[in-house]
Amino acid sequence: MDQDYKAHFKVFCSEVREWEKIHVVGSLPVLGEWNPRKSFPLTKSTDEENTFHAIVSVPSSIKEFNFRYIRVMYLDPSENNTSEPIMVLSKWETFNNARTCLIGVESQDGVARKNITDQFGSYSGKTQITDGWILNEKESVVYFRIHGEALKFFAKSYANKEYRLKVEPFDVRYSEMFSYTRKDITDRRGVWRHSSVYASMSIDGDDVVNLPTPSLPCFSNTDLSVLTREDPIFGDQYFNGSVFRNDQDYLVFRTRTVSLQNLAFRIEFYHGEKRCALSYVLPSSMSGTHGATVSPVIGLSSAPVGHINVNYMIVKRNKYTDQNLDIDSMKTTFGRYWRKRNRMLQIGHRGMGSSYTKNIGQRENTIFSLNEAARRGADYVEMDVQLTKDLKTVVYHDFHVLVAVAGRDSPSSTPTAAGENKSLHEIAIKDLTLAQLNLLHFEHISRANGSSAESPVALSVTPSKTETDELHVPFPSLAQVLRHVDENVGLNIEIKYPMYMQDGSHECQGYFEQNKFVDIILAEVAEHAGNRRIIFSCFEPDICTMITKKQHKYPVSFLVVGATNRYMPFQDIRSDCSKIAANFAAGCELLGVNFHSEELLIDQKPIEIAEKYGLIKFVWGDDLNSKEVQKHFRDEMNVDGLIFDRIGEDEVLKQNVFVVENHNRSSLFARSQHNSRSPSMSRRCMSTVE
């Protein structure tokens, strides 16, 4: 009987933190079969800094296997003294093709990879490391944003000074504070230390909690991204925090936790290197998963000297993940993958274009329009997805429609013919069930501004009696689109989530909770997408962040309006300023940005920022209806794709880039087969079967 192979793993990781461990995950059962929760832990080397190693047995029947290295940390929810530490994924290798070991070829005397030291995140000439997504039901990622007029001081001695802010998480159950700060670390691990804050708050100590501290905290370190500086990448905080100036800076703090109900934050104010004030955000201050809170700022005399406004967002695990185990598989990831091509991609806006406000013959966001764009050579088609009252996905752009309602004839009026006494009333898509959307008669919301329903310029939302098949349904579900749109065309799924506008109005009040909303859409994609090429996009930056923290298979691009005179801008500066949008996309590790053509034709600086961080550059906007403008973006700005109406009209029908590439690969393979030595008869038979 053949003996098992011995496979050696040794990896150097220069940026591993003191509290992190390195695991290996891969195609072998001993490596977890791509499940990170079943990955194999490596041992830290005692004589080589930041180096980890392990040896595993591989059955002799295995000739090849694949693997990746991951960085993890353990957090303890400390619930009823019975909970076990939970593994949290910090970073992982995300090159498209995982590492390969041809163990049958590489092994000598049954031992493979004995003298190989891998570099974490680097393989085959590529370097790519990405933040981990949420793996556990109890795990959450908390984002704190401090920006705008966040600080207000009513004590004169504190006003008109420049402050540095630092955010430290703590567990409200313990008087000690766990420190990840390097100067507090002994034996290369985080430590619990008695907080000087608690010591100063009580004379006799009666109000101090003295529960025994667990060996591990329930929270991670807090890292920082500054969107208004040149380097927006998340990283460790300085010991005395980062400069914050009202109406100038935008600070984003990020922490993971496995005990959200016990997590609080201490905001430390520094003037130079001296701490001069504190503020606290307690669990009770965060009543939902998305909102804002105002906390008092306490000075050195323990008296309030001002207050600070903080926005927060809490991202939770996709509750449908356990129904589709492939979501957590590390075998393949496209979250940061993009193949650069010489040809700029053409993306059909809502299929063939905006039909309810422009003179376009195909009803927008229908299966027919999406397929027509694909038939005319679109590489991707863009479509809009939102939810109905009964939590069903629906492909439709606007948050509201006009519903035709038949009124009663008044007693004094002359009876009217059936259907004549109708009026249009505005109603939100979220307040209608999918069945109602497919039953009632609707007009586009633009008709509320006086546009005639008989106008030849735009189509009615409700199709005519001759358009009764599924292809022309104005409210198809996302599943219908995934099943019936040409599989050769990529899908740019724009997720519609309402936002506040600069004039104080809101696109659609009382909308769905963000985690619930995103989970439903991601679950439908996971169930029906198959091997489709998919890119998500959204104007709401927090939705973009959520998607990256709930899955890693599909990439995300941030939609931005930027500086504009055509539309009412959003309140959120991340969507209002393309430079900050590019920084946001880089910091959150998105694939790229969908820039608005209006701003880029005036200022190309956002393109330069995107290129600096390797972001993919898409462009949308009415300017792109001009062939000359399209040529300008292609030749002068070297963008990766354009999103526009009427794709392929007035042109000879062509195939999209993916069809052409597949055809070229097939032709190349056929030629290589033809030029190779003739196979044996048995081989010919096998080839015929395959």
UniProtKB/Swiss-Prot annotation:
Biological process annotations from GO: glycerophospholipid catabolic process
Lineage: superkingdom: Eukaryota
Extent of Low complexity compositional bias: 676-690
A GO molecular-function annotation: glycerophosphocholine phosphodiesterase activity
Xref: InterPro entries: Carb-bd-like_fold (IPR013784), CBM20 (IPR002044), CBM20_GPCPD1 (IPR034839), GDPD (IPR051578), GP_PDE_dom (IPR030395), Ig-like_fold (IPR013783), PLC-like_Pdiesterase_TIM-brl (IPR017946)
Listed EC numbers: 3.1.-.-
Start and end residues of each CBM20 domain: 1-122
Keywords tagged on the record: Hydrolase
Residue span(s) of domain GP-PDE: 344-654
Region Disordered: start-end pairs: 670-690
Principal EC category: hydrolase
One Pfam family of this chain: C2_GDE1
Family named by the database record: Belongs to the glycerophosphoryl diester phosphodiesterase family.
Listed name of the protein: Putative glycerophosphocholine phosphodiesterase GPCPD1 homolog 1
Source organism of the structure: Caenorhabditis elegans
Lineage, highest ranks first: Eukaryota, Metazoa, Ecdysozoa, Nematoda, Chromadorea
